[in-house]
């Protein structure tokens, strides 16, 4: 049955940034598809809630408090999956971020942090996960959560967009190096109804602008992204690697314009 190709029974998945929003949705979705899920994030109470939700649905999960910018935490997250459950099949690099900031007031420190959070940490997580996937499960799948900010002209997102664009290219390059045993793909996420979009969704004027600029007429949901992540994590995508899957409501231009001061001659 073709639906069986989307099942993850007997597999073990690690999801970073799993305490809230998209990461939480992905963790729950993978568990519903049969995976044992190891969830990592910085806030223990958030992780406990995710684990409780998974267990209430009949799934199995383990919480590991993790800051993906800390080497010891990254290693503990991967090691916990292998030590507790004997294998590793899936890694979802969801942790990432940094807010909007106009280019002319973006500091070197801010830019460096955007790169570390959005591409360096996912690279190091992937590096740690690949060999255990091969050794314990014969291979696996890495799913990187990227953003449409990576391939659109979007004011105030120079640091974040650069980090996600680098993540996209890293995905392609790792896919070539890790094939055929470990697949590596990414999801280019549009505007999703999470805490980060709350300022837009709670303002009638901004929400109307967002929906008018989105062909599907609504923001995404964490479940929308979880469905895509399940496809890329599961045997259903066994002939797919090195690809960026856009899940964005059909947007080909920014759903929101962030006003920034234009450059002027110095007086």
Go through the PLM ranges and name each one.
Residues 92, 179-183, 240-242:
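Short, small/polar-rich loop/turn modules that mediate ligand/substrate recognition or access, typified
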Residues 1-4, 152, 241-267:
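Short C-terminal tail/terminal secondary-structure segment
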Residues 102-103, 107-115, 206, 210:
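Substrate-binding pocket helix/loop in short-chain dehydrogenase/reductase
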Residues 126, 163, 171:
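Active-site helix of classical SDR
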Residues 147:
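Residue(s) in the substrate-gating loop at a strand-loop-helix junction
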Residues 131, 175-180, 238:
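Alpha-helical segment proximal to the catalytic Tyr-Lys
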Residues 12, 19-21:
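Conserved glycine-rich cofactor-binding loop
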């Amino acid at each position: 049955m073709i639906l069986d190709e989307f099942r993850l029974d007997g597999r073990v998945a690690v999801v970073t940034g799993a305490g809230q929003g998209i990461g939480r949705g992905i963790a729950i979705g993978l568990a519903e598809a049969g995976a044992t899920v190891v969830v990592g994030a910085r806030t223990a109470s958030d992780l406990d809630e995710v684990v409780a939700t998974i267990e209430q649905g009949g799934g199995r999960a383990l919480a590991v408090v993790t800051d993906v910018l800390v080497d010891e935490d990254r290693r503990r997250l991967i090691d916990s999956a292998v030590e507790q459950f004997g294998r590793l099949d899936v890694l979802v690099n969801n942790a990432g971020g940094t807010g909007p900031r106009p280019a002319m007031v973006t500091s070197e420190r801010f830019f460096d942090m955007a790169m570390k959070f959005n591409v360096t940490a996912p690279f190091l997580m992937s590096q740690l996960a690949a060999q255990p996937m091969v050794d314990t499960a014969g291979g696996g799948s890495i799913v990187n959560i990227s953003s449409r900010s990576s391939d659109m002209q979007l004011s105030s997102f120079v640091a974040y967009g650069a980090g996600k664009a680098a993540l996209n290219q890293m995905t392609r390059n790792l896919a070539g190096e890790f094939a055929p045993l470990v697949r590596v793909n990414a999801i280019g996420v549009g505007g999703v109804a999470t805490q980060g979009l709350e300022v837009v969704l709670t303002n009638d004027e901004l929400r109307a602008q967002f929906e008018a600029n989105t062909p599907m007429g609504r923001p995404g949901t964490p479940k929308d992204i979880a469905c895509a992540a399940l496809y890329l994590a599961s045997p259903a995508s066994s002939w797919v690697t090195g690809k960026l899957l856009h899940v964005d409501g059909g947007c080909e231009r920014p759903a929101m314009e962030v006003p920034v001061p234009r450059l002027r001659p110095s007086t």
